[in-house]
């Protein structure tokens, strides 16, 4: 048994569940402390011997797991001009799985011993992981069924990973989908739209910030792809009152961007072709 102060109960449960999650055989506990056994299923990205798991965001530490024990990695022990330092200092949730003896630990067995051997292991693994991240994201993009899905996939991955400069630089090198350029070079995540066919043709951007009550409206020539949870693309059916539905949607969701493709059928088809999207991928209202 472990006596704790009542005020420390939640901290104790969180720390205990973090320690026990890497145990191959879970101990018998007479209270539910919410241990989620370690797996790759909850990872943003993963490889054979690493993963990035941001499930608990602010509490997700960078760790080396050796012998079923997770040792927190201290970024300040690494070269501050290195990609390793940037990834460890600015990122969270990195789990590196090590074999017994890959790293050294202190005599108390409570933390890593930051000798040259241990630091070299961590540095080499982070360098390898960055290469794998680039390869994986490019594979995810290339495996998409359509160009539009590829564009959204890359942008969504950027949202998950790009807080860390070294990861951001790796992901920014991905510019194509099976040889096709994903975005305009001079507009971040932008797709240049086709010229109008008729006077009523347009793509209109409706956007709302959670900090403002008003909804902004702008006709655009370049569509900027943003993470899927903040973006909806709609084909207008003039018989169904699309604009009132868009305003209601943005008011309910508190924030986001809606792109309304309006006008002639020829223009709508041209926009879909430019985006690389099928009608089934776009909302019709």
Residue ranges and their predicted role:
Residues 202-285:
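Long, charged low-complexity terminal regions
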Residues 115, 120, 136-138, 145:
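Extended, well-ordered alpha-helical scaffold/bundle regions in very large, multi-domain proteins
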Residues 14, 24-131, 154-223, 244-245:
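GHKL/Histidine-kinase-like ATPase module
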Residues 39-41, 140-155:
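Short, highly charged C-terminal tails/helix-capping segments
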Residues 1-4, 11:
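GHKL (Bergerat-fold) ATPase N-terminal catalytic module, capturing the glycine-rich phosphate-binding loop
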Residues 15-19:
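Alpha-helical scaffold elements adjacent to nucleotide-binding pockets in ATP/GTP-utilizing enzyme cores
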Residues 33-35, 141, 262-268:
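Short beta-alpha junction loops
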Residues 127-141:
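Flexible helix-coil linker/hinge segments at domain or subdomain boundaries
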């Amino acid at each position: 048994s472990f006596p704790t102060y009542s005020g420390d109960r939640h901290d104790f449960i969180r720390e205990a569940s973090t320690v026990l999650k890497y145990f191959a055989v879970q101990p018998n506990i007479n209270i539910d402390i919410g241990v989620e056994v370690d797996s790759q299923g909850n990872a943003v990205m993963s490889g054979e011997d690493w993963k990035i798991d941001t499930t608990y965001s602010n509490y997700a530490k960078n760790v080396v797991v050796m012998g079923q024990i997770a040792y927190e990695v201290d970024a300040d022990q690494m070269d501050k001009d290195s990609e390793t330092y940037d990834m460890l200092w600015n990122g969270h949730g990195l789990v590196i799985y090590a074999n017994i003896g890959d790293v050294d630990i202190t005599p108390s067995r409570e933390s890593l011993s930051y000798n040259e051997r241990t630091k070299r292991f961590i540095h080499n693994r982070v360098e390898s992981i960055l290469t794998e991240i680039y390869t994986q994201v490019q594979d995810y993009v290339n495996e998409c069924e359509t160009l539009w899905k590829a564009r959204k996939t890359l942008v969504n991955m950027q949202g998950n990973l790009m807080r860390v400069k070294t990861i951001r630089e790796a992901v920014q090198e991905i510019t194509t989908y099976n040889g096709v350029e994903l975005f305009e070079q001079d507009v971040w995540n932008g797709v240049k739209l086709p010229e109008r066919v008729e006077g009523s043709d347009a793509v209109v951007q409706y956007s709302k910030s959670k900090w403002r009550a008003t909804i902004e409206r702008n006709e655009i020539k370049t569509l900027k792809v943003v993470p899927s949870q903040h973006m909806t693309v709609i084909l207008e059916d003039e018989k169904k009152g699309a604009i009132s539905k868009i305003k209601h949607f943005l008011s309910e969701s508190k924030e986001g961007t809606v792109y309304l493709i309006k006008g002639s059928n020829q223009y709508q088809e041209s926009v879909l072709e430019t985006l690389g999207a099928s009608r089934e991928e776009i909302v019709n209202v």
